[in-house]
A protein has these predicted regions:
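Conserved beta-strand-loop-alpha-helix junction that forms the acyl-donor binding cleft
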Residues: 127-137, 154-157
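Active-site acidic-Proline motif in GNAT/NAT acetyltransferases
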Residues: 97-103, 131-132
Length: 166
């Protein structure tokens, strides 16, 4: 995957440990997300997320991405290709900076992602949102993700699994 093709509007970088402070600065201002999906973010939790993989996946399929407008980090995405099957990409995490929310920027990023993944031969994108989080549910449904009917429980919350055909 050529990450530069994920957006024609923003600079997209593969995030590393050098970017943890920037990612933390973006995430810590999104208190509503962590109200529904505890615990609250820390630099250590970001470092852990940057390395987290589902069973039987390789790091070559994981892209922890930052979207920049100029020098400003405006969005973060954890994307895993070919999961849970070879035709599906999985968004493990997506968050925009609070200063750019409700302006169509997140939806634009997701639209560009869907178009590029379709060009690469993927047929769907899967993700989950925390049940009861109205902001997340509204955003993903607005972006054509449909509930699969599958949910699973974690410590403290339930995840609603959703899918979008591309």
């Amino acid at each position: 995957m050529e990450i530069s093709r994920l957006s024609d509007r923003y600079t997209v970088l593969r995030m590393t440990e050098d970017h943890i402070a920037e990612v933390y600065a973006l995430c810590r201002n999104n208190a509503l997300y962590y109200h529904y999906c505890p615990p609250f973010v820390t630099e250590d939790s970001i470092a852990s997320d940057m390395k987290a993989l589902p069973p039987d996946k390789e790091y070559s399929d994981k892209y922890y991405l930052g979207y920049y407008e100029g020098e400003k980090l405006i969005a973060v995405m954890d994307l895993i290709l070919r999961f849970p099957d070879k035709d599906t990409a999985f968004i493990g995490f997506f968050m925009t900076d609070i200063s750019v929310q409700n302006a169509g920027i997140g939806s634009g990023i997701i639209g560009s992602l869907c178009a590029y993944l379709k060009d690469l031969g993927f047929s769907s994108i899967r993700l989950g949102w925390v049940k009861g989080n109205p902001q997340s549910e509204h955003f993903w449904k607005k972006n054509l993700f449909l509930e699969t009917g599958v949910t699973y429980d974690t410590d403290g919350y339930t995840v609603v699994v959703a899918n979008r055909k591309i």
